[in-house]
Structures are given as structure tokens and as C-alpha cells.
Amino acid sequence: FMSGDALSICQAVKANRGKVIVQVDRLVDTPSRPRNAIIPGCLVDAIVVAEPEEKNEAYKALTGSFEIPYEEWNQWSEKLEQVSAKQPKNTTVANIIGKRAAKELRVDDIVNIGIGIPETVARFARKSGMLDMITLTVESGGIGGFPVSGEAFGAMIGAASVYDMANQFDLYDNGGLDVCFMGALEVDKEGNINAHRGPGAFAGIG
């Protein structure tokens, strides 16, 4: 699941002389079939065996392993927000922006939802009953469904498809979007945008 992203990241790291550390559930003595080996050993510098973790039931909604009816999206979204360490934007300003931006949506639009305030656009699309008339996407590879807000942003509830991030950006770069709502770290009065670095923080992804 989403294994292509892991390969793309490993290839990029090695191409830039970085070190690749792979986290796995377990080590095995019997080699996998070649077609099942997503990351070749020559790209791996170290392996870490992860300790078993207790999994919250709410996160099952994000696996894509079972279908979630449209009528249950609200219920699952609320469950996920309750267990999220990072709460979604819910300020007056964020809601005003999100509500206004959602009015730009048209039937059959393919839409990219960015992190931060753009998450509110998805919420207002849901409240207005437009979710089943448009296709929401997120950069991490989810298409269709409803983007999860807060800590788990990047995942989708009720996704129609989940594929690799590189394929998602192929869709974006080739003009497959009708509208895109993006967040920003800083914006000045002239509309210049800083999406890379803030005070006392690591460089953002831009």
C-alpha cells in the first residue's frame, strides 16, 4: 500500500548522497518474490524493526481496505478529529475564507485541497451537499472522498482511489485540476508568498 512513494523517496535520497533507513514490521529468512520487493537492497543503508503499536480503531477508515458509505463520512471525520493531536483550523477567519472559497466549486470539478485553511473548503463543500458532485484530491495520492483534517491530513475518508504521490503530481502538472486551494506560511500585502521557511522552524516543503 503506497509502496511506490517509499521507492521514489529512496531513489531521491540516494541520488543526493543521502542515507536510507527503512522501518519494517519484521525480518524474514525467506526472500520475497522479486515482483514483491519494492525497494531493492542496494538502496538501503539501515533497517529498523518497529515495535508493535496499539492502533486506534478510527484510523481504519483511512486504510482504503473497506468502503465507507457517503452517509458515514461525517461520523468517521468526527472520530478522527477527536483522536488527532493537531486540531483542524476552526477560527472565524479560516471559516470565512473557507466558506467563500467553496462558492468557487462547480459540478464535476476535480479539486486539490492543500493543508491548513484550505481544509475548511472541504468542510464547507460537505455542509453544502456538493461532495458527491465534485472530486476532491490531496497531494499524497488520495482521489475522491473527503480529506481528513488536523494531524491525519493527507489521508482520505471514502477515497475512490489511492495511488502514489508521483502519479498524483502527474495529474496536477498535466493540467488535470479544475481548481486548487493552497495554504501558505506567510503572505504579504503585495501577494508575495513564503511557503518555505518560518522563524525557528525547519524548511517547509514549499
Q: What is each model feature region?
A:
Residues 1-79, 147-206:
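Conserved phosphate- and dinucleotide-binding cores of soluble alpha/beta proteins
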Residues 79-165:
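N-terminal active-site beta-alpha-beta segment that forms phosphate/nucleotide-binding
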